[in-house]
């Protein structure tokens, strides 16, 4: 399978899984930190099981700080996502979270110094307008906080993507 097909399958799978994520957080009817705890524990167990493979252990030993930074960014992503869903509408969270690749493009440009295509800059501009519209509809402090958490979640995903792009040997 070529990289394009693999990437498309991964993105499509991620969209399907994440489309139910906000609903599941709402259905849990628990406080945010309880949900964060259980999500974190399950993520730790899943990633821990994955890291038992010889290739993953070698990757962890080769660059432990990068691996730890990636894990920390995943934790921030999860925490901010749950807090966002609790504080604002799932629709707002999904719209704002969809900007993660655009954050990755910005971080890649300004941190890694890579060039960004014109159509990506145009997409970033359109997404920024969309985020302004979402934030303009935040009539309460709680909505505004939720939208802010969603933006932080999206930025953490973008930062993690940039980190992994810089260090492709990390599993």
Q: Where do the PLM segments sit?
A:
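Helix-helix packing/entry segments at the starts of transmembrane helices
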Residues: 93-99, 164-171
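Specific alpha-helical transmembrane segments that line the substrate/conduction pathway
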Residues: 34-45, 82-113, 153
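Hydrophobic transmembrane alpha-helices of multi-pass small-molecule transport proteins
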Residues: 47, 51, 74, 106, ...
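Specific transmembrane alpha-helical segments of multi-pass solute transporters/efflux pumps
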Residues: 17, 48, 54-92, 96-97, ...
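Helix-loop interface residues and adjacent transmembrane-helix termini in multi-pass membrane transporters
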Residues: 29-30, 87, 113-115, 169-170
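Glycine-/small-residue-enriched transmembrane alpha-helix faces in small-molecule transporters
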Residues: 1-36, 72, 80, 139-166
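Cytoplasmic-side transmembrane-helix entry/capping segments in multi-pass membrane proteins
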Residues: 7-11, 62-72, 114-128, 146-150, ...
